[in-house]
Amino acid sequence: MSTRSGKGITLRELCVFAMLGALMFASKLIMEVLPNIHILGLLIVVYTIAFREKALIPIYIWIMLNGLLAGFATWWIPYLYVWAVLWGMTMLLPKKMPKPVAVVVYTTVCTLHGLFFGVLYAPAEALLTGLDFNGMLAWIASGFVFDIMHAVGNFAAGLLIWPMSQLMLKLKRMYRL
């Protein structure tokens, strides 16, 4: 750990990131009754806008908590990279966009991640379960309706990215994170 010199993270940041990871975990648990509907995409994009590369800390805290609760089984392994893809897509976007553009772009990125979640997950599923390429394509096709639900949920949540990111940036400045 380090001070505000720019290297490492401060104790304050570590505590905040732990709470943000726990918030992701609690939000997913609360929304478990709805198949593939959650605010994880919203939170990942907001955290990435506010904390950039440090956003990986709460993301991986959430992934670890998920594994601890549900077990570190084969379903968990793709989570190690699938959620980082959304983080990476957000990192590649310009930091400063006009509000109307940002609203559309962030919502679109969040929606597309939901739509292609099964495609991103499929290679690990195929490797871990012994599916050949055709089996993997069939696996993707059989789950596509859930990816559509995921995309619709991410679209709805994605509409909140701009106001939530502005609030997170304000809190970040206020608490000197």
Task: Label each region the model flagged.
Residues 15, 19, 23-26, 61, ...:
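Lipid-exposed faces of alpha-helical membrane segments in multi-pass integral membrane proteins
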Residues 43, 85, 89, 120, ...:
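Hydrophobic/aromatic residues in alpha-helical transmembrane segments
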Residues 76-77, 99-177:
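Membrane-embedded alpha-helical hairpins and interfacial helices in multi-pass inner-membrane proteins
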Residues 25-38, 61-96:
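Interfacial aromatic-anchored transmembrane helix boundaries in multi-pass membrane proteins
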Residues 9-17, 41, 55, 59, ...:
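Residue-level signature of transmembrane alpha-helical entry/exit and packing/kink sites
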Residues 49-52, 89-98, 164-172:
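Structural signal for the C-terminal ends of transmembrane alpha-helices
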Residues 4-9, 93-105:
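Membrane-interface helix-boundary motifs at transmembrane edges
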Residues 1-50, 54-62:
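Hydrophobic transmembrane alpha-helices
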